[in-house]
Swiss-Prot record:
Belongs to the AIDA family. Coiled coil: none annotated. PROSITE patterns: C2_AIDA. Acts as a ventralizing factor during embryogenesis. Inhibits axin-mediated JNK activation by binding axin and disrupting axin homodimerization. This in turn antagonizes a Wnt/beta-catenin-independent dorsalization pathway activated by axin/JNK-signaling. One of its GO terms (cellular component) is membrane. One of its GO terms (molecular function) is phosphatidylinositol binding. It comes from Xenopus laevis. Residues 156-303 form the C2 Aida-type domain. This is Axin interactor, dorsalization-associated protein A.
């Protein structure tokens, strides 16, 4: 089996796995599988011609499939809605993906690949020159999976309730930044880490901000933490990384981050401080982003069965 056939076989198996989860009603697993495959397809679609076995037309089709998977992921996050990209729509992608080399028909959906943005290896951003108008602090990276072409909005549904267990919903209301109006395509990556910086739950991205005004970027979006509060390990923390797109350099950058520790989990309004990048998941060398009264504004809701 050639390398290309191996890749196509791997992608097809991943898509089948996602549609199986989808048809079984295992939404969290389906979303995760779709998003993993979408990232792989986006990476291939954006690869230089001299490092890809696929033609430019084939890569365009691959990019469109990635967009469709992102649309299905978004549809699954809002299970009350009967609209959006359906499971039957996704199944129409299976024969296209498996025969991408010979596919020469019109793509069945009116979508476009995610716009080309530079893909950075972890740590690469550290070596790039920082703009003078950049935020206070040096350059750095956020999550290890810094991937500028992620489909915006990868929120997961609420976990099933369990007797005696507490579910946590965090509404990200707004973030205060001195140059809020200049941020392009801003979103927040939410992760739950242990003391060693290891993920305890799937990483989630908010959709892009709803509006910007003065010194605030508004999100007004709810995040369902993917672990019952009682099951979070001692010393764990919930991280919020604010990211935005830099058109001059064509990549998405982490601007700052905030975190909330376990003793801060309580119902009601919460305001937490912002720190300079790079994101310090181990919380050992923290530096405040600014001395100005600018914070991340949250609203916590606890639900116990």
């Amino acid at each position: 089996m050639s390398d290309m056939n191996k890749i196509l076989h791997k992608w097809s198996a991943s898509l089948k796995k996602g549609t199986d989860f989808d048809s079984w009603g295992q939404l969290v697993e389906a979303i995760d599988e779709y998003q993993i495959l979408a990232r792989q397809l986006q990476k291939e679609a954006q690869s230089p011609a001299n490092s890809s076995d696929f033609t430019e037309d084939q890569k365009k089709t691959i990019g469109k499939i990635a967009t469709c998977l992102g649309l299905r992921s978004a549809a699954l996050q809002y299970t009350q809605s009967q609209e959006g990209f359906t499971l039957e729509d996704v199944k129409k992608l299976e024969p296209i993906l498996s025969s991408i080399v010979t596919f020469n028909k019109e793509f069945p959906f009116d979508v476009q690949p995610v716009p080309l943005r530079r893909i950075l290896a972890p740590g690469e951003e550290e070596n790039l020159e920082v703009d003078e108008e950049e935020e206070d602090g040096g350059a750095g990276i956020g999550s290890p999976d810094l991937f500028p072409a992620r489909v915006p909005g990868t929120l997961l549904p609420r976990l099933p309730s369990e007797p005696g267990m507490t579910l946590l919903t965090i509404k990200i209301e707004k973030i205060g930044l001195k140059d809020a109006g200049q941020c392009i395509d801003p979103y927040i990556t939410v992760s739950v880490k242990d003391l060693n910086g290891i993920d305890l739950t799937p990483v989630q991205d908010t959709p892009m901000a709803t509006r910007k005004e003065d010194t605030y970027v508004h999100f007004n979006v709810e995040i369902e933490i993917q672990k019952h509060v009682e099951k979070l390990t001692k010393g764990a923390a919930i991280f919020f990384e604010f990211k935005h797109y830099k058109p001059k350099k064509r990549f998405t950058s982490t601007k700052c981050f905030a975190f909330m520790e376990m003793d801060e989990i309580k119902p009601g309004q919460t305001v937490i401080e912002l720190y300079k990048k790079p994101t310090d998941f181990k919380r050992k060398k923290l530096q405040l982003l600014t001395k100005k009264p600018l914070y991340l504004h949250l609203l916590q809701t606890l639900l116990k069965d």
